[in-house]
């Protein structure tokens, strides 16, 4: 005999649109612009949509007339970019809304109790990143070198903030705090060729 049974479930929806434009001139000057809009059901009305642009440019110095063609460096490109991204992961499907659960008993009466506090002000966590880099190809492209310096700023971090026990709830999801990351990346690749 089954005395009681329960089940839980949930779903969320994400809608995205994307536009990208690539431009170049004489294989020396390169430009890219993109923008995307994402709509998530995890957020309340008014905060569901986020817009995230990005732009990048590059200068292939090795294709300029003043650049020596018979040197060690066979390709040289300077590039820079800036872009914004959004995050909606790490939170529940309904954290912007109150959730209630039935089956609670008080003084012999069945009832419904709120189990999750609503936060209709929840919004996208956003990160913007700036990159400055240099690409080198040496010895007729046998050796390639890449160098990057980046700065990443994240704001409106999605975080479960603990609440005092007197509230009857353990936490509430909020946009709290910010974070900054900086770093330098360096990579070298060597293509070894042999002849018989």
Question: How should these model regions be labeled?
Answer:
Residues 1-196:
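Extracellular/periplasmic, surface-exposed regions of secreted and cell-surface proteins
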């Amino acid at each position: 005999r089954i005395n009681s049974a329960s089940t839980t479930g949930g779903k969320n929806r994400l809608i995205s649109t994307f536009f990208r434009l690539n431009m170049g001139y004489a294989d020396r000057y390169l430009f890219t612009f993109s923008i995307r809009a994402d709509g998530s059901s995890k957020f309340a009305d008014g905060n569901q949509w986020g817009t995230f642009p990005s732009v990048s440019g590059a200068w292939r110095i090795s294709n300029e007339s003043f650049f020596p063609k018979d040197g060690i460096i066979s390709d040289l490109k300077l590039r820079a970019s800036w872009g914004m991204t959004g995050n909606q992961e790490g939170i529940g499907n309904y954290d912007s809304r109150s959730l209630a659960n039935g089956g609670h008993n008080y003084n012999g009466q069945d009832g419904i109790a709120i189990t999750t506090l609503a936060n209709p002000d929840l919004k996208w966590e956003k990160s913007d990143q700036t990159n400055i880099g240099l690409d080198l190809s040496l010895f007729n492209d046998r050796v390639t070198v890449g160098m990057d310096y980046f700065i990443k700023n994240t704001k409106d971090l999605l975080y479960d903030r603990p609440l005092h026990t007197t509230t009857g709830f353990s936490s509430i999801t909020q946009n709290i705090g910010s974070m900054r990351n900086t770093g330098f990346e360096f990579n070298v690749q060597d293509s070894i060729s042999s002849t018989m």
